[in-house]
Amino acid sequence: MDLQGRGVPSIDRLRVLLMLFHTMAQIMAEQEVENLSGLSTNPEKDIFVVRENGTTCLMAEFAAKFIVPYDVWASNYVDLITEQADIALTRGAEVKGRCGHSQSELQVFWVDRAYALKMLFVKESHNMSKGPEATWRLSKVQFVYDSSEKTHFKDAVSAGKHTANSHHLSALVTPAGKSYECQAQQTISLASSDPQKTVTMILSAVHIQPFDIISDFVFSEEHKCPVDEREQLEETLPLILGLILGLVIMVTLAIYHVHHKMTANQVQIPRDRSQYKHMG
């Protein structure tokens, strides 16, 4: 009985040691995160890099702005009116992140943590007619804001921290092994904990890859958003049509020139038979 009694605590101690070892391994493998926004030529765009074991595992370039509605008292101090705060993600933000095989995460904090953005990416495999196909997507966005912060909010009623979350989000869907690129603006609606308020997140100049980065600090092949592809087609279509029209004109002129030359070299046969004697 004594041996059995001693064996149970030993097993518990072993479990505790294993849990501590697992925790220490996670801490030692914790990724380093860099804010490289100063390298961007676009003052509104931020650049974030997450690295694990000296290798880039997540890269994100984008400009982000949040449209946040909030209530203030009307001049009669009886009615409420809704104002709007435009909050841009600024340079010099604090960044955290982690990479995983099927889940990656990016967190950004700015203005003394009055604002926080959390983006969760997932990689999934789907069974298609031609076989399994893997994609990644932005599956969740969370925005925490403090309406008592005076730079963007003016005399907000019930000022304090609020959390806005996406609902059943599936954005930036991209084939696995590729990066997502989109210069056009994209909007994502977030339901706020502030009653009956919806926060709008506006993304632009986006270039993101949260999985399968092969070269350090280098994006993989781009998967462009449909809006960019359509705009690119609209830009190149007039050029293509112009080239086709120019080619048609050149071919027409060449045919005319050849026809004219062949016609000029032909012997003109007189219609009047009396003129045959003058030939030869």
From Swiss-Prot:
| InterPro entries documented for this protein | Lamp2-like_luminal, Lysosome-assoc_membr_glycop
Annotated signal peptide: 1-29
List all annotated glycosylation positions: N35, N53, N127
Q: Does the keyword Transmembrane apply?
A: yes
Q: Does the keyword Ribosomal protein apply?
A: no
Per the UniProt topology annotation, the Cytoplasmic ranges are 257-280
Q: What is its main location?
A: membrane
Q: Name one Pfam family in it.
A: Lamp2-like_luminal
Tissue occurrence: Expressed in plasmocytoid dendritic cells. Expressed in suprabasal skin keratinocytes and squamous cells (at protein level). Expressed in the brain and weakly in spleen and skin. Expressed in plasmocytoid dendritic cells.
Q: Which UniProt keywords apply?
A: Cell membrane, Cell projection, Cytoplasmic vesicle, Endosome, Glycoprotein, Membrane, Signal, Synapse, Transmembrane, Transmembrane helix
Where does the record say this protein resides? Cell membrane; Cytoplasmic vesicle, Secretory vesicle, Synaptic vesicle membrane; Endoplasmic reticulum-Golgi intermediate compartment membrane; Endosome membrane
State the GO CC annotations: cytoplasmic vesicle membrane; dendrite membrane; early endosome membrane; endoplasmic reticulum-Golgi intermediate compartment membrane; endosome membrane; GABA-ergic synapse; growth cone membrane; late endosome membrane
Q: Which PROSITE patterns does the protein's record reference?
A: LAMP_1 (PS00310)
Give the induction note.
Answer: Up-regulated upon CpG dinucleotides activation. Down-regulated upon activation by Toll-like receptor (TLR) ligands.
The processes (GO biological process) annotated in the record are: establishment of protein localization to organelle; presynaptic modulation of chemical synaptic transmission
Post-translational modification as stated in the protein's UniProt record: Glycosylated.
Topological domain (Extracellular) residues are 30-235
Topology with respect to the bilayer: Single-pass type I membrane protein
Please name the PANTHER family in this protein's record. LYSOSOME-ASSOCIATED MEMBRANE GLYCOPROTEIN (PTHR11506), LYSOSOME-ASSOCIATED MEMBRANE GLYCOPROTEIN 5 (PTHR11506:SF35)
Sequence similarity: Belongs to the LAMP family.
Q: What else is known?
A: Appears to be a novel specific biomarker for blastic plasmocytoid dendritic cells neoplasia.
Q: State its role.
A: Plays a role in short-term synaptic plasticity in a subset of GABAergic neurons in the brain.
Protein's name in the database:
Lysosome-associated membrane glycoprotein 5
